[in-house]
């Protein structure tokens, strides 16, 4: 394994890299715990908690691990408090940070590893959403980085004698990544690309250890395959249908790149792209950088190029690829620091301060909605932080109307995101159905036929006149308005839910569920 040249004389970034990283992990974990306890669940989080039970071998949107975790928390007595549900994901990111340090230290030195981990914690898509929300990205990225660490030991550490054990570890961590999110397939594809293109390490393709690791990794997909085989391969059809081309759209490509830069933060995203391109240019001549590059390139390229066909996708889809570039960025930053570049030090300071300010603004806005009071015009443009507002007032509104104890009553919503919010607010004892054409996992939680003849409360988040009577009129004997409930944030009205009482569910709503 080729290590970088020794740093020039001068004070290194960290006198004690291990202590500095420990401080970053402890501080970051403390901040995430505070945020988890004070800010409600997002749309995706509410949905995942709501459909996690009954426990299933797999789920419509993703492999099962990130659904099993909140189900286990609730079963073990953690209840439905946001902090209890989010805590495992916070701990996953603490582990991801430590693994990033170890990968960077093994390949490029302790200072590089520490700097890569610090920069990782200054990027919102990693430090905030991956680091503290109930999403499959948390366990995915932890196990991806663990796999890369095992591969680095097996392939790039000349002093390593236990290569077979590291290959087995890579297989186990890859299997856990497979249980987390479909992005894990890039671990196998990227490793294969590395072995094929590196002449010195191509010999591993003729040895049993990598193939045993592949078999273990693919075993992680067994629950996914079994569930999909019983449900007409719906997950693969759903995921595969997201990238259907519709001509050539350069602006969509620019929108995708802009979204990625925004989620990572532009002043970190640009250097990540620079070190990635540099590693691509060096190729197999620099095995350490090439290994990271081979695995990172898959998610970045595969989820960016389809945007040229008119589908920008979501900006966090490429994030697992960028994750693996942080050890490279740490190495480049350490080298510039050793050269005495003042711009690097100012850039690090700016990155830390800017991230702190952005986090403070977003967190306080999510909790209080203060920006609308300071700048009322912002309210007319929409507030994305309202997605973090729990619908806790819904339960009180239904209880005040004497509806929660009504036998056989169920709650319905016109979309999976609203159904998720309602289901999380009401708890597992109140059945919630998603009466829409694309209910996602809600289409498998309850069988509509079990509720025929029952009454329902239909919940609709709307700022104007609700279309619920027209939309569902032919499926119920009668639908009457129950008025509205105001969802409050920091004691002030923030959103409005229209409520309807629907009598006698007469026929199932047509779902696009195989």
What residues fall within each predicted segment?
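Transmembrane-helix signature of polytopic, membrane-embedded enzymes
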Residues: 3-4, 8-10, 19, 100-122, ...
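Membrane-interface transmembrane helices that cradle and orient dolichyl/undecaprenyl
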Residues: 11, 107-111, 147-167
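Transmembrane-helix motifs of polytopic, lipid-linked glycan transferases
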Residues: 22, 87-108, 146-150
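Short helix- or helix-capping micro-motifs
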Residues: 25, 116-124, 174, 178, ...
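Membrane-interface alpha helices of multi-pass inner-membrane proteins
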Residues: 54, 164-181, 216-218
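Short acidic/glycine- and proline-prone juxtamembrane loop motifs at membrane-interface regions
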Residues: 131-139
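Transmembrane-lumen/periplasm boundary regions of multi-pass, lipid-linked membrane glycan transferases
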Residues: 176, 188-288, 295, 299-307
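Membrane-proximal, lumen/periplasm-facing interface regions of secretory-pathway glyco-
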Residues: 315, 342-407, 417-431, 437-440, ...
């Amino acid at each position: 394994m080729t290590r970088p040249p020794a740093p020039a004389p001068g004070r290194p970034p960290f006198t004690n890299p291990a202590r500095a990283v420990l401080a970053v992990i402890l501080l970051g974990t403390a901040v995430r715990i505070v945020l988890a306890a004070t800010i409600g669940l997002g749309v995706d989080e509410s949905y995942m908690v709501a459909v996690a039970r009954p426990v299933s071998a797999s789920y419509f949107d993703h492999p099962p691990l990130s659904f099993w975790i909140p189900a286990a928390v609730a079963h073990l007595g953690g209840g439905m408090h946001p902090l209890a549900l989010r805590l495992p994901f916070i701990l996953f990111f603490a582990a991801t940070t430590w693994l990033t340090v170890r990968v960077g230290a093994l390949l490029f030195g302790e200072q590089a590893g520490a700097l890569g981990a610090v920069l990782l914690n200054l990027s919102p898509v990693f430090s905030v959403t991956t680091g503290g929300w109930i999403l499959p990205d948390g366990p995915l990225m932890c196990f991806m980085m663990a796999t890369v660490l095992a591969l680095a030991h097996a392939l790039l550490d000349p002093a390593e004698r236990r290569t077979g054990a590291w290959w087995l570890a890579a297989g186990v961590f890859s299997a856990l990544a497979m249980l987390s999110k479909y992005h894990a397939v890039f671990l196998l594809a990227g490793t294969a690309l590395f072995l094929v293109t590196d002449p010195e390490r191509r010999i591993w393709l003729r040895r049993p250890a990598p193939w045993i690791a592949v078999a273990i990794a693919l075993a992680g997909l067994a629950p996914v395959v079994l569930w999909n085989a019983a449900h007409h391969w719906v997950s693969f059809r759903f995921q595969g249908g997201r990238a259907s081309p519709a001509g050539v759209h350069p602006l969509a490509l620019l929108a995708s790149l802009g979204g990625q830069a925004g989620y990572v933060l532009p002043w970190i995203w640009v250097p990540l792209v620079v070190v990635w391109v540099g590693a691509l240019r060096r190729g197999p001549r620099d095995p350490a950088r090439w290994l990271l590059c081979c695995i990172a390139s898959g998610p970045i390229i595969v989820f960016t190029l389809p945007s040229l066909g008119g589908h920008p996708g979501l900006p966090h889809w490429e994030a697992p690829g960028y994750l693996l570039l942080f050890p490279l960025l740490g190495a480049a930053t350490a080298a510039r620091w050793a050269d005495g570049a003042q711009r690097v030090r100012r850039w690090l300071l700016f990155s830390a301060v800017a991230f702190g300010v952005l986090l403070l603004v977003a967190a306080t806005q999510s909790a209080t909605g203060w920006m609308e009071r300071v700048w009322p015009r912002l309210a007319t443009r929409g507030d994305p932080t309202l997605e973090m507002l729990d619908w806790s007032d819904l339960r009180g509104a239904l209880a005040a109307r004497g509806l929660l104890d009504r036998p056989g009553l169920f709650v319905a919503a016109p979309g999976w995101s609203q159904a998720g919010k309602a289901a999380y607010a009401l708890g597992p004892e109140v059945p919630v159905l998603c009466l829409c054409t694309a209910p996602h996992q809600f289409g498998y939680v309850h069988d509509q036929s079990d509720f025929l003849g029952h009454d329902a409360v239909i919940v609709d988040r709307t700022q104007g006149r609700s279309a619920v009577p027209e939309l569902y009129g032919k499926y119920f004997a009668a639908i009457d308005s129950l008025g509205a409930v105001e969802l409050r944030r920091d004691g002030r009205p923030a959103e409005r839910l229209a409520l309807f009482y629907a009598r006698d569910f007469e026929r199932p709503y047509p779902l696009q569920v195989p």
